[in-house]
Amino acid sequence: GFKVERWRAYDETGMVFGYPSEVEVDVTVSDGKLILIEVSSHVRASDVLQFRRKAELYEKMTGRKPDRLIIVTPYIDEKALEAARQLGVEAYTKV
């Protein structure tokens, strides 16, 4: 089995958005693998980069490196798909 929980933290240095702000991401552990998940109605390349930065912040603050980064969306731009490939983010569009 697995459990999904929302992780929230305050990004004091502005690592994710470029200014200090609240950051949240969905986290699940399945078969001992740590997975970060972002669900969005429409994903652009900038969203993929932002999600990658959330993962880096998560690792920095918790000391736990995610095994997988997953974006789930009904619509993703072509440039976002390319960004996901280059940044090691899995994109699921037909779930």
Model features per residue range: what roles?
Residues 2-31:
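Active-site metal-binding core of divalent-cation-utilizing nuclease and nuclease-like domains
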Residues 6-9, 38, 71, 93:
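Structural signal for conserved beta-strand scaffold positions within catalytic alpha/beta enzyme cores
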Residues 23, 65, 87:
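Residue-level signal for beta-strand positions within conserved beta-sheet cores that form or flank
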Residues 57-65:
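Arginine/glycine-rich "motif VI" loop of SF2 helicases in the C-terminal RecA-like domain
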